Amino acid sequence: MADTEPSPLFVFSTIAIIISTFVIFYFVQQSKKNTPVLKPDTFQKFPLIEKTRVSHNSSVYRFGLPKSTDRLGLPIGQHISIGATIGGKEVVRSYTPISTDDELGYFDLLIKTYENGNISKHVDSKKVGEYVEIRGPKGFFTYTPNMVKSFGMIAGGTGIAPMYQIITAILRNPADKTKISLIYANVTESDILLKSELDKWAEEHPDNFSVHYVLNEAPENWKGSVGFVTPEIIDSKLPKASDDSNLLLCGPPPMISAMKKAAVGLGFAKAKPVSKLGDQVFVF
Protein backbone atom coordinates (compact mmCIF):
# COMPACT_ATOMS: atom_id res chain seq x y z
CA MET A 1 0.00 0.00 0.00
CA ALA A 2 1.37 3.42 -0.94
CA ASP A 3 2.13 5.94 1.83
CA THR A 4 -0.24 8.88 1.97
CA GLU A 5 0.69 12.32 3.27
CA PRO A 6 -1.61 13.83 5.90
CA SER A 7 -3.95 16.42 4.53
CA PRO A 8 -3.17 20.11 5.16
CA LEU A 9 -6.43 20.37 7.12
CA PHE A 10 -5.34 17.56 9.44
CA VAL A 11 -1.94 19.15 10.00
CA PHE A 12 -3.50 22.55 10.69
CA SER A 13 -6.03 21.07 13.11
CA THR A 14 -3.31 19.18 14.98
CA ILE A 15 -1.14 22.29 15.33
CA ALA A 16 -4.14 24.33 16.48
CA ILE A 17 -4.96 21.76 19.16
CA ILE A 18 -1.35 21.73 20.40
CA ILE A 19 -1.19 25.53 20.54
CA SER A 20 -4.56 25.77 22.29
CA THR A 21 -3.50 23.18 24.86
CA PHE A 22 -0.27 25.07 25.53
CA VAL A 23 -2.09 28.41 25.89
CA ILE A 24 -4.63 26.94 28.30
CA PHE A 25 -1.86 25.30 30.34
CA TYR A 26 0.10 28.57 30.43
CA PHE A 27 -2.80 30.63 31.71
CA VAL A 28 -3.75 28.00 34.28
CA GLN A 29 -0.18 28.06 35.59
CA GLN A 30 -0.13 31.86 35.60
CA SER A 31 -3.37 31.95 37.54
CA LYS A 32 -1.68 29.93 40.25
CA LYS A 33 1.01 32.57 40.61
CA ASN A 34 0.71 35.87 42.44
CA THR A 35 -2.34 34.55 44.27
CA PRO A 36 -3.87 37.02 46.75
CA VAL A 37 -3.88 35.36 50.16
CA LEU A 38 -5.93 37.61 52.46
CA LYS A 39 -9.49 36.74 53.44
CA PRO A 40 -11.59 39.60 54.86
CA ASP A 41 -13.70 37.48 57.22
CA THR A 42 -11.31 34.70 58.16
CA PHE A 43 -8.22 34.84 60.37
CA GLN A 44 -5.31 32.95 58.84
CA LYS A 45 -1.98 32.04 60.39
CA PHE A 46 1.17 33.62 58.98
CA PRO A 47 4.67 32.71 60.21
CA LEU A 48 7.15 35.31 61.42
CA ILE A 49 10.23 34.89 59.22
CA GLU A 50 12.28 37.94 60.21
CA LYS A 51 12.31 40.69 62.84
CA THR A 52 14.31 43.89 62.48
CA ARG A 53 14.55 46.36 65.36
CA VAL A 54 14.34 49.91 63.95
CA SER A 55 14.16 51.88 67.22
CA HIS A 56 14.21 51.23 70.95
CA ASN A 57 10.53 50.25 70.90
CA SER A 58 9.63 49.56 67.26
CA SER A 59 10.36 46.73 64.86
CA VAL A 60 9.64 45.67 61.31
CA TYR A 61 8.11 42.19 61.33
CA ARG A 62 8.28 40.16 58.14
CA PHE A 63 5.65 37.46 57.74
CA GLY A 64 5.75 34.71 55.14
CA LEU A 65 2.99 33.83 52.69
CA PRO A 66 2.19 30.20 51.78
CA LYS A 67 4.13 30.33 48.51
CA SER A 68 7.00 32.48 47.27
CA THR A 69 4.82 33.63 44.35
CA ASP A 70 1.88 34.66 46.55
CA ARG A 71 0.97 38.28 47.18
CA LEU A 72 -0.85 39.55 50.24
CA GLY A 73 -3.74 40.99 48.24
CA LEU A 74 -3.97 44.33 50.02
CA PRO A 75 -4.99 47.44 48.04
CA ILE A 76 -2.67 50.40 48.60
CA GLY A 77 -3.93 52.42 51.55
CA GLN A 78 -5.87 49.66 53.28
CA HIS A 79 -4.95 47.70 56.39
CA ILE A 80 -5.08 44.27 58.00
CA SER A 81 -6.29 43.09 61.41
CA ILE A 82 -4.26 41.04 63.86
CA GLY A 83 -6.29 38.94 66.29
CA ALA A 84 -5.33 37.07 69.44
CA THR A 85 -6.88 35.69 72.60
CA ILE A 86 -5.25 37.55 75.47
CA GLY A 87 -6.35 37.09 79.06
CA GLY A 88 -9.33 35.08 77.88
CA LYS A 89 -10.56 37.86 75.62
CA GLU A 90 -10.44 38.21 71.85
CA VAL A 91 -8.40 41.30 70.96
CA VAL A 92 -8.12 42.76 67.45
CA ARG A 93 -5.97 45.66 66.23
CA SER A 94 -5.43 47.12 62.77
CA TYR A 95 -2.09 47.78 61.07
CA THR A 96 -1.03 48.95 57.63
CA PRO A 97 1.83 47.00 56.04
CA ILE A 98 4.74 49.11 54.83
CA SER A 99 5.23 46.64 51.98
CA THR A 100 3.12 46.54 48.82
CA ASP A 101 1.84 43.73 46.62
CA ASP A 102 4.96 44.15 44.48
CA GLU A 103 6.69 42.08 47.17
CA LEU A 104 5.86 38.42 46.64
CA GLY A 105 6.02 35.72 49.27
CA TYR A 106 5.98 38.03 52.31
CA PHE A 107 4.71 41.27 53.84
CA ASP A 108 6.16 43.70 56.39
CA LEU A 109 4.51 45.33 59.39
CA LEU A 110 6.00 48.25 61.32
CA ILE A 111 4.79 47.99 64.92
CA LYS A 112 5.62 50.00 68.01
CA THR A 113 5.49 48.01 71.24
CA TYR A 114 3.49 49.79 73.94
CA GLU A 115 3.66 48.82 77.61
CA ASN A 116 -0.13 48.50 77.69
CA GLY A 117 -0.48 47.40 74.07
CA ASN A 118 -1.91 43.88 74.10
CA ILE A 119 -1.46 43.11 70.41
CA SER A 120 1.87 44.93 70.00
CA LYS A 121 3.31 42.97 72.95
CA HIS A 122 1.78 39.78 71.56
CA VAL A 123 3.52 40.26 68.21
CA ASP A 124 6.78 41.33 69.85
CA SER A 125 6.81 38.13 71.90
CA LYS A 126 6.78 35.95 68.79
CA LYS A 127 9.92 34.12 67.74
CA VAL A 128 10.87 33.39 64.15
CA GLY A 129 8.78 30.43 63.01
CA GLU A 130 5.83 31.22 65.27
CA TYR A 131 2.49 32.37 63.88
CA VAL A 132 0.23 35.40 64.07
CA GLU A 133 -3.43 35.38 62.99
CA ILE A 134 -4.38 38.00 60.40
CA ARG A 135 -7.38 38.89 58.24
CA GLY A 136 -8.19 41.66 55.77
CA PRO A 137 -8.21 43.83 53.79
CA LYS A 138 -10.04 46.60 55.62
CA GLY A 139 -10.41 50.32 55.11
CA PHE A 140 -12.05 53.00 53.02
CA PHE A 141 -8.99 54.34 51.20
CA THR A 142 -7.71 52.70 48.03
CA TYR A 143 -4.97 54.47 46.13
CA THR A 144 -4.96 54.57 42.34
CA PRO A 145 -2.21 56.26 40.31
CA ASN A 146 -2.69 59.98 39.62
CA MET A 147 -5.96 60.11 41.56
CA VAL A 148 -4.95 63.61 42.69
CA LYS A 149 -2.27 66.06 41.65
CA SER A 150 -0.68 66.16 45.09
CA PHE A 151 -0.83 64.70 48.58
CA GLY A 152 -0.02 66.54 51.76
CA MET A 153 0.73 64.04 54.52
CA ILE A 154 1.06 64.49 58.27
CA ALA A 155 2.23 61.48 60.25
CA GLY A 156 3.16 60.92 63.87
CA GLY A 157 5.16 57.92 65.11
CA THR A 158 4.03 54.65 63.55
CA GLY A 159 1.41 56.66 61.67
CA ILE A 160 4.10 56.73 59.00
CA ALA A 161 3.07 53.18 57.93
CA PRO A 162 0.17 53.97 55.54
CA MET A 163 2.03 57.01 54.22
CA TYR A 164 5.11 54.91 53.54
CA GLN A 165 3.07 52.35 51.63
CA ILE A 166 1.42 55.01 49.46
CA ILE A 167 4.72 56.82 48.84
CA THR A 168 6.33 53.53 47.81
CA ALA A 169 3.58 52.82 45.29
CA ILE A 170 3.80 56.31 43.79
CA LEU A 171 7.57 56.52 43.49
CA ARG A 172 7.87 53.02 42.02
CA ASN A 173 5.51 53.90 39.18
CA PRO A 174 7.15 56.10 36.51
CA ALA A 175 3.72 56.90 35.08
CA ASP A 176 2.50 58.27 38.42
CA LYS A 177 3.16 62.02 38.57
CA THR A 178 1.60 62.62 41.99
CA LYS A 179 3.59 65.01 44.16
CA ILE A 180 3.99 64.12 47.83
CA SER A 181 4.86 66.43 50.72
CA LEU A 182 5.27 64.79 54.13
CA ILE A 183 5.46 66.26 57.62
CA TYR A 184 6.64 63.60 60.06
CA ALA A 185 6.43 64.32 63.80
CA ASN A 186 8.14 62.45 66.64
CA VAL A 187 9.36 63.03 70.18
CA THR A 188 13.11 62.53 69.66
CA GLU A 189 15.36 61.97 66.68
CA SER A 190 15.78 58.30 67.61
CA ASP A 191 12.01 57.90 67.31
CA ILE A 192 12.02 58.75 63.60
CA LEU A 193 11.16 55.51 61.81
CA LEU A 194 12.36 54.66 58.30
CA LYS A 195 14.34 57.91 58.17
CA SER A 196 17.08 56.62 55.90
CA GLU A 197 14.50 55.40 53.38
CA LEU A 198 12.58 58.68 53.49
CA ASP A 199 15.74 60.76 53.10
CA LYS A 200 16.87 58.59 50.19
CA TRP A 201 13.55 59.09 48.42
CA ALA A 202 13.74 62.85 48.94
CA GLU A 203 17.22 62.86 47.41
CA GLU A 204 16.33 60.60 44.48
CA HIS A 205 12.91 62.15 43.71
CA PRO A 206 13.23 65.87 44.54
CA ASP A 207 10.47 66.83 42.10
CA ASN A 208 7.95 64.36 43.53
CA PHE A 209 8.72 63.91 47.21
CA SER A 210 9.75 66.06 50.16
CA VAL A 211 9.88 65.34 53.89
CA HIS A 212 10.00 67.74 56.84
CA TYR A 213 10.68 66.46 60.35
CA VAL A 214 9.25 67.90 63.57
CA LEU A 215 10.59 66.91 67.00
CA ASN A 216 9.37 67.70 70.49
CA GLU A 217 12.90 67.26 71.83
CA ALA A 218 15.47 68.24 69.23
CA PRO A 219 19.26 67.87 69.43
CA GLU A 220 21.66 70.71 68.77
CA ASN A 221 22.03 71.76 65.14
CA TRP A 222 18.66 70.18 64.31
CA LYS A 223 17.55 71.29 60.83
CA GLY A 224 13.87 70.45 61.18
CA SER A 225 11.17 72.10 63.27
CA VAL A 226 10.89 71.92 67.05
CA GLY A 227 7.72 71.53 69.10
CA PHE A 228 4.36 70.61 67.66
CA VAL A 229 3.11 70.65 64.08
CA THR A 230 1.58 74.11 63.72
CA PRO A 231 -0.69 75.64 61.07
CA GLU A 232 2.30 77.72 59.99
CA ILE A 233 4.39 74.59 59.35
CA ILE A 234 1.53 72.96 57.45
CA ASP A 235 1.01 76.07 55.35
CA SER A 236 4.69 76.34 54.45
CA LYS A 237 5.47 72.66 53.82
CA LEU A 238 2.31 71.13 52.33
CA PRO A 239 0.20 71.88 49.22
CA LYS A 240 -2.58 74.40 49.61
CA ALA A 241 -6.18 73.23 49.81
CA SER A 242 -7.60 72.61 46.34
CA ASP A 243 -9.71 70.16 44.35
CA ASP A 244 -6.50 68.47 43.14
CA SER A 245 -4.87 68.15 46.57
CA ASN A 246 -5.74 65.81 49.43
CA LEU A 247 -4.51 65.84 53.01
CA LEU A 248 -3.76 62.47 54.65
CA LEU A 249 -3.42 62.16 58.43
CA CYS A 250 -2.26 59.32 60.66
CA GLY A 251 -0.91 59.44 64.20
CA PRO A 252 -1.84 59.64 67.89
CA PRO A 253 -5.44 60.82 68.51
CA PRO A 254 -4.51 64.13 70.23
CA MET A 255 -2.25 65.04 67.32
CA ILE A 256 -4.88 64.12 64.72
CA SER A 257 -7.51 66.18 66.53
CA ALA A 258 -5.21 69.21 66.40
CA MET A 259 -4.33 68.60 62.74
CA LYS A 260 -7.99 68.38 61.68
CA LYS A 261 -8.68 71.71 63.37
CA ALA A 262 -5.61 73.29 61.77
CA ALA A 263 -6.62 71.98 58.34
CA VAL A 264 -10.01 73.68 58.53
CA GLY A 265 -8.29 76.95 59.37
CA LEU A 266 -6.16 76.54 56.24
CA GLY A 267 -9.14 76.11 53.94
CA PHE A 268 -9.49 72.32 53.88
CA ALA A 269 -12.86 70.65 54.24
CA LYS A 270 -13.76 69.51 57.75
CA ALA A 271 -12.73 65.89 58.28
CA LYS A 272 -15.67 63.52 58.67
CA PRO A 273 -16.03 61.23 61.72
CA VAL A 274 -15.28 58.27 59.43
CA SER A 275 -13.16 59.14 56.41
CA LYS A 276 -14.19 57.89 52.96
CA LEU A 277 -12.36 57.70 49.66
CA GLY A 278 -12.69 61.07 47.95
CA ASP A 279 -12.65 63.13 51.16
CA GLN A 280 -10.32 66.11 50.92
CA VAL A 281 -9.00 65.26 54.39
CA PHE A 282 -8.62 61.55 55.07
CA VAL A 283 -7.74 60.16 58.50
CA PHE A 284 -6.38 56.62 58.65
Curated annotation (Swiss-Prot):
Name of the top EC class for this enzyme: oxidoreductase
Assembly and interaction partners: Monomer. Component of the 2-(3-amino-3-carboxypropyl)histidine synthase complex composed of DPH1, DPH2, DPH3 and a NADH-dependent reductase, predominantly CBR1.
Protein name: NADH-cytochrome b5 reductase 1
UniProt record, GO biological process: protein histidyl modification to diphthamide; tRNA wobble base 5-methoxycarbonylmethyl-2-thiouridinylation
EC number: 1.6.2.2
Record domain FAD-binding FR-type: where: 41-144
Record-linked CDD domains: cyt_b5_reduct_like (cd06183)
Gene3D superfamilies in the cross-refs: Nucleotide-binding domain of ferredoxin-NADP reductase (FNR) module, Translation factors
Role according to the record: NADH-dependent reductase for DPH3 and cytochrome b5. Required for the first step of diphthamide biosynthesis, a post-translational modification of histidine which occurs in elongation factor 2. DPH1 and DPH2 transfer a 3-amino-3-carboxypropyl (ACP) group from S-adenosyl-L-methionine (SAM) to a histidine residue, the reaction is assisted by a reduction system comprising DPH3 and a NADH-dependent reductase, predominantly CBR1. By reducing DPH3, also involved in the formation of the tRNA wobble base modification mcm5s 2U (5-methoxycarbonylmethyl-2-thiouridine), mediated by the elongator complex.
GO CC, any one term: mitochondrial outer membrane
Record carries keyword Glycoprotein: no
Main location: mitochondrion
Pathway connected to this protein: Protein modification; peptidyl-diphthamide biosynthesis
Membrane-topology annotation of the record: Single-pass membrane protein
Residues engaged in binding FAD: 124-139, 150-182
A single MF term (Gene Ontology): NADH dehydrogenase activity
Cofactors named for this entry: FAD
Pfam families in the cross-refs: FAD_binding_6 (PF00970), NAD_binding_1 (PF00175)
Coiled-coil portions: none
Record's keyword terms, sorted: FAD, Flavoprotein, Membrane, Mitochondrion, Mitochondrion outer membrane, NAD, Oxidoreductase, Transferase, Transmembrane, Transmembrane helix
Catalytic activity, as annotated: 2 Fe(III)-[cytochrome b5] + NADH = 2 Fe(II)-[cytochrome b5] + NAD(+) + H(+); 2 Fe(3+)-[Dph3] + NADH = 2 Fe(2+)-[Dph3] + NAD(+) + H(+)
